[in-house]
Amino acid sequence: MIERHMVSTTFDLPGHTVDASLGMVRGIIVRSRSVVGSIGAGLQTIFGGNISLYTSLCERARQDAYERMLADAAMLGANAVIGMRYDATEIGAGVTEVLCYGTAVHARRNV
């Protein structure tokens, strides 16, 4: 498994040299809101502020997509991912796709 400090939103890893680019990797998750969750979130909007039900749903979806991307990179033999990004698209009413993607690389520590 790829160590968390070996994932970067930039295209370099401080203290490391990229030896090989192994290709694009991604993790995709599709989530829907439950009826109960939608009602609870609707009640929270009345009072304003953070809608905690949606926040936790979004955090969980991003974490799951991230884990899938790391597994994809590990299958290619990567020990790092650079240029990592998230994207989200609403597919339908209450259904959202979360994509986590980046470039799988093999990097070595500078001596």
From Swiss-Prot:
InterPro entries: UPF0145_dom_sf, UPF0145_YbjQ-like. It holds the Pfam family YbjQ_1. HAMAP family: UPF0145. Belongs to the UPF0145 family. This is UPF0145 protein Bphy_3680.
